[in-house]
Amino acid sequence: MGIVFNYIDPVAFNLGPLSVRWYGIIIAVGILLGYFVAQRALVKAGLHKDTLVDIIFYSALFGFIAARIYFVIFQWPYYAENPSEIIKIWHGGIAIHGGLIGGFIAGVIVCKVKNLNPFQIGDIVAPSIILAQGIGRWGNFMNHEAHGGSVSRAFLEQLHLPNFIIENMYINGQYYHPTFLYESIWDVAGFIILVNIRKHLKLGETFFLYLTWYSIGRFFIEGLRTDSLMLTSNIRVAQLVSILLILISISLIVYRRIKYNPPLYSKVGALPWPTKKVK
């Protein structure tokens, strides 16, 4: 039972001394697919087809940097003793919430510079972000990381998972919860929901609902993981951040609904906030 017949090597191929890992390839595929999905929404919104290029570039760049900084902050006792490890990203260690924060800030700045409405852009890219996240979780699978607690092989078989997933959940002599798969399915479901209801939502609400949906799933799935960043011995950082994002997002939606009094559900489509003109 303990033999892995289809073990996946995290390294896809080597270019001389450089090892190209499946993790990086899958993340890149997720970003590219998300970009093409967002492009379709962009054209429907009447914006120039190149509008997202700078936004995605800077959001991805600063999101990656912020994801590393976020991870280092919550693992500071280790990095304080091993400062040379801070820049060794190839040893692992990024956090999606840090990436979201960095990407969000960069995206808003680019929107302001280009005189774009950040709420409209947020609505356009929200489904793409959660789709990319769902795809990116398979990079964790390839790295044999971000898994949950130990389970039996019988438990995994009861989930009717493909053998290659079951066999690669056998890590260091033990089977584990495939939390990467749980989150991937949750994210893809969120993508499907968002692309089907966003035309009935008001400006900004698609993005806020993305944050809410993702955070609900992350809160529960995080409770199964064994590699969580911890604020204290009992408080997981990702769960705390998820709760905050849920409260903030729902509060903003409710606040706008009360202040501007639009119908809860409209067949007309998204209407802009009373803000600067969308270009």
UniProtKB/Swiss-Prot annotation:
Task: Give me the Gene Ontology terms describing cellular component.
Answer: plasma membrane
Locate the residues binding a 1,2-diacyl-sn-glycero-3-phospho-(1'-sn-glycerol): R137
The residues the entry assigns to the signal sequence are none
Transmembrane ranges, per UniProt, are 18-38, 55-75, 89-109, 203-223, 235-255
Membrane topology of this protein: Multi-pass membrane protein
Q: Which GO terms describe its molecular function?
A: phosphatidylglycerol-prolipoprotein diacylglyceryl transferase activity
Q: What superkingdom does the record give?
A: Bacteria
Protein name stated in the entry: Phosphatidylglycerol--prolipoprotein diacylglyceryl transferase
What subcellular locations does the record give?
Cell membrane
In UniProt terms, what function does this protein have? Transfers the N-acyl diglyceride group on what will become the N-terminal cysteine of membrane lipoproteins.
The UniProt record lists the keyword Nucleotidyltransferase: no
Does the entry feature the keyword Acyltransferase, yes or no?
A: no
| Record gene name | lgt
- Which UniProt keyword terms apply here? Cell membrane, Membrane, Transferase, Transmembrane, Transmembrane helix
Enzyme class of the recorded protein, top EC level = transferase
Which taxonomic lineage is given here?
A: Bacteria, Bacillati, Bacillota, Bacilli, Bacillales
State its Enzyme Commission number(s): 2.5.1.145
